[in-house]
Amino acid sequence: MEKNTTTLEEYIRLASEILRKDENILFAYLFGSYVRNEVWFGSDLDIAIYFRSEPELLDIGGICNDLEEALNVKIDLAMLNHLPDKHPELGFNIINEGILLFTKEESTLRNYKHKVLLHYLDVKPLLDIVNRKFNERLNNGR
């Protein structure tokens, strides 16, 4: 890939145009280092997608390839459908700090956000304990 001078606004526009064409994609977020303005050489563009139905692996690869060709940057795709159950903190961070690229169904997006929030609030006290204990060990040199 060549040196990339694409702006965040251009990434948002191009990614939205490409993803919106796929009938199986209901909504998508841009998240990660580009959104936080922490881009370094070699940073990839993180995109999270919610699918109407479970996509085939080849379909995901095709989406990733289409995005990489159009945006001229390495793409890291996250599938949102099962994220609240498997990684509630990441799901929460995506909807809280990410940029919504588009949605085709407001009610599905609203229900998804509700589910993410409930799962995150369920595990947050445990995450806080784990993080506090981890930091204590680091500070004590263990």
Residue ranges and their predicted role:
Residues M1-N24, R36-N37, R52-R142:
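Catalytic core of pol beta-like nucleotidyltransferases
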Residues D46-Y50:
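Short beta-strand->loop micro-motif that forms the acidic, two-metal-ion catalytic signature
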Residues L26-Y34:
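Short gly/ser-rich loop at a beta-strand->alpha-helix junction or flexible surface loop bordering the NTP-binding
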